Each structure stands twice: as structure tokens, then as C-alpha cells.
Amino acid sequence: MMQRILKHGRLASAIVAGGLVAGLATVGRLKASDHQDTPEVELSPRYDVNDVYVFPAATPGRTVLVLGTSSPLTPAKTPSFTFGTKDQELYQIKVDNTGDAVEDLVFQITFTGAAGHQRVTLHGPVKPNTTGPTNTLVGGKKTVSGPVNTVLGSSDGVQLFAGPRDDPFFIDLEQFFRIVPDRKPVTGPLSQLPSTPTATSFRAAGQALDYVRGFNDMAIVIELPTSLLVANPQHPGRFGVWGTTSRARGI
């Protein structure tokens, strides 16, 4: 049994099925950002959800879901960085397609194997056994399974990729920690910044640095027919998406 939510990721809520990313604000976005929100994920960054993205695929009628995790500062030349294995960690993307802020569908992603030889398995989209902070493995037939760093596909049009990818987020992170030093990490070069505020605003355009450029996050990317996400494919409406990681009981 997998239990105990360690971190809820970004909520990309009230998304119009098949709509444009630029149009999300017109349907009422719920904004959230809570990196490093507990000492546990600060010391075990693999459990930290970086970002969740949802956008239309290049092919009409399809949607892309992205869950970024494993610390936002994974050096690009760190091929041995791994996902948590099935006996340790459960990665999930959850979908609410009825508007009650409770998951109606889940994608459960698990990993096996050691660094350089990991395999990924996806179950979903499927109705969850439980909802809320307690999570159990759905079991049943695998949707897709195979090695990481490979685009995998299923007969019903679900595609999966899991592996390191250039972090798509843009932020002058060094300056941010000069403004809010109590949020700086406890390890790495940014941990050496002063512990008291030394700035009150971000640097001006042209001076700001995209600090995460050249760093990876560990990405789980799913592309599938939008009809598999909505309650009624004939009237798709809106659906909300969020990501979580859970740790097995006793770990």
C-alpha cells in the first residue's frame, strides 16, 4: 500500500479540454507554488514536485500532461539520477473531470531497477481505489511499461516518457533567495548565500539570470486522447489536473 502524500504539486485547474494554454486564465486558474514546503522534501528532494503542466498536443484531440520532480537543480551531466522505485515511491497525476476537486481518474507511475537500468510502468487513466491523501495501487493491466528515457506507447493511444529533461521553468533563483533567504536550500551552491535578506526585488530585464538553465528535472510526460480525460467526450468541458508523490508506509 502506498500512503501519505508528501507534496501536492501545482494545480492546473479548470482547464478547458482542447483549449489553448493562453486561454487558461479565462476559465479561472488556481495558482500555487510550494517548493521545499517541508523539511522532509528539503532533505529528500526526489519527493518534491517541481511543476505540473497541461497543454494541447501537436495533434488535434490530444493532451499532454507533464509532472516534473526530483529537485529543480539536477545537473545536466548526472545520468545516474533516478526515480524512486516502486517499493519506495508512487508518482501520480490526478484528474478531476466533474468539478468537485476530487480525483475521478489517476495515472499511477512506478519504477523498478537501479540507476542506468530503470524501467517505468504506467497504470491509467483509471478510476482510483481511494481518493484524497491515502493512496493505494490500482493494479490490473498495465497501460504501458518499458525502459526510461524512451518514448513508449499503448494500443489505445497513450504515450509515456520518463527521464531527465531540461527544466522548462524560468526564474532568477539566486536573486529570489537573496530576497527570501529562509527558502534557500540546505545543500549546494545556493546554500552559501547570506541568511539575511540582501535584496528587495528581482534584477531588471537584461540583468536577471535564468538560473535553472542547463539543469534538468526528472520528467514524467504523458500524451493521450483528450477523450480519455473527460467525463463526457461529447461535451468535454473542463477538467483539473494535479500531481503528487507518495511514500510507502513505514519508509
Predicted feature descriptions by range:
Residues 1-2, 218:
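Detector for methionine-enriched segments
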Residues 2-15:
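Bacterial N-terminal signal peptides that target proteins for export
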Residues 3-5, 23-33:
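Generic start-of-chain signal for non-secretory N-termini
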Residues 13-23:
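Bacterial N-terminal signal peptides
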Residues 28-251:
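Surface-exposed extracytoplasmic segments
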